[in-house]
């Protein structure tokens, strides 16, 4: 039973899981703990990187991974907990010391069929945790906050939350804000940008304080956290323009990243994106509509079509631009599309 030998922190939600889990790991590691990480990009035991196939591994793989982490001396395990993992009972007998709900927006409806079923899948995590931290900027988060039976706190940009952000200043290379809780405010400077990252850092900070770290320990560590590759990642180019790579693959995520970047963009905002194959088709036109609302020019391309025809996927995307006046180009080959976007 390696799951009895470590303390578990779970993070669930449509967007923000990877960044939030990585910031939690960074804070705990900076304060002397050995931490295991289980997530979308990779699994980690301290600095050791392990390959992953699923956000939440199958139960037999997960238990083997737990054993490696326990034998290595991990104090904590921070994991992304997917809706698939919960519905399919992949996490087995794992009990969580703390669990975070980031948000719930359209995704995986090819599997869950309805948003209600998707919500109920996410909610399962909060029946196996001692403490819940819930984002009440999100409508489903507000609902969840009224339904959980464990100890609970809330976070968000809204001042109605237990942990909230004030005086937020976004820049191309970072963000500053005041973290407010318990009637006090603390200045925070992070090397990440985007309103969504303010929310992710709030969540990670609140969880670590719940685990017993002081605000000074948390905030000192947060300032040195650089974020996650492929999550609002600024790519150095040496050119007179900025390039940002982001994982946004839902309508809400597209809107969030473009809305944030738009705030400090000088000149045009060019958005290059595609949609994955063999996944929820109904979000494709919605992603295009979200992109058209904030970008000045779109480059529409292929993004891991799997078994589908890339051109058919692009036609689904273009349906979302009906009636829009935004200029766009279709370049099916992704490498050529990136070159075109740079040009």
Model-derived regions, located:
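C-terminal structured "cap/appendage" subdomains that terminate the fold
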Residues: 321-343
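Conserved helix/coil segment N-terminal to the catalytic DExD/H
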Residues: 84-92
């Amino acid at each position: 039973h390696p799951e009895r030998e470590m303390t578990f922190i779970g993070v669930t939600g449509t967007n923000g899981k990877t960044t939030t889990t990585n910031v939690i790991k960074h804070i705990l590691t900076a304060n002397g703990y050995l931490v295991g990480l289980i997530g979308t990009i990779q699994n980690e035991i301290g600095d050791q990187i392990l390959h992953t196939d699923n956000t939440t591994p199958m139960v037999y793989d997960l238990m083997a991974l737990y054993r490696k982490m326990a034998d290595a001396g991990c104090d904590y395990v921070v994991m992304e907990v997917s809706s698939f993992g919960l519905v399919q009972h992949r996490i087995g007998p794992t009990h969580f010391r703390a669990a975070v709900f980031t948000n719930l927006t359209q995704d995986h409806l090819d599997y869950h069929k309805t948003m209600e079923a998707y919500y109920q899948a996410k909610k399962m995590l909060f029946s196996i945790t001692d403490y819940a931290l819930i984002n009440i900027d999100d409508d489903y988060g507000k609902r969840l906050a009224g339904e959980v039976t464990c100890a609970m706190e809330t976070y968000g940009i809204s001042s109605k939350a237990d942990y909230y952000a004030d005086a937020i200043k976004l820049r191309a290379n970072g963000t500053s804000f005041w973290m407010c809780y318990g009637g006090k405010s603390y200045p925070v400077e992070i090397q990440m940008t985007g309103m969504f990252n303010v929310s992710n850092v709030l969540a990670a900070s609140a969880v670590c304080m719940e685990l017993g770290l002081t605000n000074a320990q948390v905030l000192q560590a947060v300032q040195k956290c650089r974020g996650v590759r492929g999550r609002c990642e600024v790519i150095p180019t040496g050119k007179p323009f900025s390039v940002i790579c982001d994982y946004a693959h839902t309508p809400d995520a597209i809107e969030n990243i473009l809305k944030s970047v738009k705030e400090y963009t000088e000149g045009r905002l060019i958005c290059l994106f595609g949609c994955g194959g063999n996944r929820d088709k109904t979000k494709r036109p919605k992603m295009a509509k979200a992109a058209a609302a904030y970008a000045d020019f779109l480059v529409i391309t292929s993004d891991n079509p799997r078994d589908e025809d890339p051109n058919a996927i692009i036609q689904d995307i273009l349906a979302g631009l009906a009636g829009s006046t935004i200029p766009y180009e279709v370049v099916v080959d992704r490498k050529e599309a990136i070159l075109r976007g740079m040009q």
